[in-house]
Amino acid sequence: MKKSTVIVLSLAAFVLLSVMQFSAAEDIKMEVEEQRGYCAEKGIKCHNIHCCSGLTCKCKGSSCVCRK
């Protein structure tokens, strides 16, 4: 009984740490893209870069552009 509990808790901790590491990697990736200084202006496609301040990336079908 004790052995199976330890195994389950260890597995749960491993999964939790893996998820946290993946989300931290995504945050770092987004920060690097923003630090490069490139941003999409209004009406420009925003698939690979973030929109400039005050704009958000809005999609209609497969076409995504920056809008207010």
UniProtKB/Swiss-Prot annotation:
GO CC terms of this entry: extracellular region
Q: List the disulfide bonds.
A: C39-C52, C46-C57, C51-C66, C59-C64
The compartments listed are:
Secreted
**Does Signal appear among the keywords?**
yes
Propeptide positions in this record? 26-36
Tell me the tissue specificity.
Expressed by the venom gland.
Q: Which residues form the signal peptide?
A: 1-25
**GO: which molecular function terms?**
ion channel inhibitor activity
Task: Please provide the record's keywords in A-Z order.
Answer: Disulfide bond, Knottin, Secreted, Signal
- What's the family? Belongs to the neurotoxin 33 family.
- Free-text comment about domains: The presence of a 'disulfide through disulfide knot' structurally defines this protein as a knottin.
- Any idea what this protein is called? U4-agatoxin-Ao1a
The root-end lineage is: Eukaryota, Metazoa, Ecdysozoa, Arthropoda, Chelicerata
